[in-house]
Amino acid sequence: MATVVLGGDTMGPERIFPNQTEELGPHQGPSEGTGDWSSEEPEEEQEETGSGPAGYSYQPLNQDPEQEEVELAPVGDGDVVADIQDRIQALGLHLPDPPLESEDEDEEGATALNNHSSIPMDPEHVELVKRTMAGVSLPAPGVPAWAREISDAQWEDVVQKALQARQASPAWK
């Protein structure tokens, strides 16, 4: 890590304030009465200047609930939308463009509906699907040991008791 030498002193990664021998800029000087920690005039002067390090300042938020009420404009109002976009640009924010309505998505949805309706779902086919899915089994490592040791009926009892206990206990707020 590089170090910078100023006036014979070394500066590390932490911020070092200039010492008495270095030149201070117009906004950087020590304020009078720094040894006195009372809440007198110097603090008020500091608040009035409004500029801190690197030009940042404190701006209090509105605390009056009556003034916070804002009427929402209709979405289609062009002047309001343009005004909002101007404000976003002035603040230096980037708002991504909304996704375009794609005709491909509509075609895919229509194709899916056509495919769904073309599958014959008569009672015989439903039973075939059920038998096929019943024959599907997960590999043994995918099922934890505790799940192999408890029957479905026992597991349903455990779940029901847990749900009843949760409903009976007072809700924590």
Curated annotation (Swiss-Prot):
UniProt lineage: Eukaryota, Metazoa, Chordata, Craniata, Vertebrata
Keyword check for DNA repair: no
UniProt feature, compositional bias: Acidic residues: 38-48, 100-109
Source organism (scientific name): Macaca fascicularis (Crab-eating macaque)
Gene: MEA1
Known role: May play an important role in spermatogenesis and/or testis development.
PANTHER family: MALE-ENHANCED ANTIGEN-1
Residues with PTM Phosphoserine: 102
Protein name: Male-enhanced antigen 1
Alphabetical UniProt keywords: Developmental protein, Differentiation, Phosphoprotein, Spermatogenesis
InterPro entries: MEA1
Region ranges (Disordered): 1-78, 93-122
Gene Ontology biological process terms in this record: cell differentiation; spermatogenesis
